[in-house]
Swiss-Prot record:
Protein family according to the UniProt entry: Belongs to the eukaryotic ribosomal protein eL18 family.
Cellular component GO terms, alphabetical: cytosolic large ribosomal subunit
Keyword check for Transferase: no
Protein name, per record: Large ribosomal subunit protein eL18
Molecular-function GO terms, alphabetical: RNA binding; structural constituent of ribosome
InterPro entries xref list: Ribosomal_eL18, Ribosomal_eL18_arc, Ribosomal_uL15/eL18, Ribosomal_uL15/eL18_sf, Ribosomal_uL15_CS
Organism of origin: Methanothermobacter thermautotrophicus (strain ATCC 29096 / DSM 1053 / JCM 10044 / NBRC 100330 / Delta H) (Methanobacterium thermoautotrophicum)
Pfam families linked: Ribosomal_L18
Keywords: Ribonucleoprotein, Ribosomal protein
GO biological process, one term: translation
Length: 121
């Protein structure tokens, strides 16, 4: 018999439910995909460094990380980063480059029908 593993973080559970709900209401499949990625075990969740965001993004682009953004590397252009969480050094480097750090819950409420977003894992 397979053991079902459930999330114990109530904020994450609420976020996943909200993402699924917005996906069906707005017809935006991206939120369903992000919810599925967040349901993975913690050890399989994305942890992305600033250097990877720098390599795979362009000026004034929106990047979504379904996990944590870490502060290793440099960012040389302005980018809007949406993630589950940020390390303090990552937040400082993004803001120093003129970018913006947003949480997943905030972006889903403000702009549920978002377009032109790049997912980086």
């Amino acid at each position: 018999m397979v053991r079902k593993i459930t999330k114990t973080n109530p904020n994450l559970i609420k976020l996943i439910r909200n993402l699924r709900k917005k996906s069906s209401q707005e017809g935006a499949a991206i939120w369903k995909d992000v919810a599925r990625r967040l349901e993975r075990p913690t050890r399989n969740r994305a942890a992305v460094n600033i250097s990877k965001i720098n390599r795979h993004s362009d000026e004034d682009e929106t990047v979504l990380v379904p996990g944590k953004v870490l502060g290793s590397g440099n960012l040389d252009h302005r980018v809007q980063v949406v993630a589950l969480s940020f390390s303090q050094t990552a937040r400082d480097k993004i803001e120093r480059a003129g970018g913006e750090c947003l949480t997943l819950g905030k972006i889903v409420e403000e702009n549920p029908a978002i377009k032109n977003i790049k997912i980086i894992e």
